[in-house]
């Protein structure tokens, strides 16, 4: 199956990540942000009908979080630390991951959570991706 549960590991406290020898590298900031989002999503998903997965097609794309409710994909969420320069590989990887995930799951509710970047909606191929700052996303009441 392309939809997996339990293969990505997250720490219940981001302080545990600080113990890693490369904790101050930029990639680590992205890992920490993804961990914060994972813990918050697990806190918000309280119903037995709601589940959290990630989606990966090896060597093709990955979606960090797939929110499923009663066997229906409700939202695709991608997390990145920097989302500033549209010409970068990172920018394209994040957008393409959401678009390919949307096509595969038939879900058009896509969110990109970032620490740095511009809060906006991006339209690509007729689909809307909501780009939100992590602080705003963490403070909203959703689910």
Question: Where are the predicted features?
Answer:
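Active-site ExK catalytic segment of metal-dependent nucleases
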Residues: 68, 73-86
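Mg2+/Mn2+-dependent nuclease catalytic core
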Residues: 82-100
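Accessory nucleic acid-recognition modules appended to NTPase machines
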Residues: 1-73
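Arginine/glycine-rich "motif VI" loop of SF2 helicases in the C-terminal RecA-like domain
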Residues: 44-47, 97-107
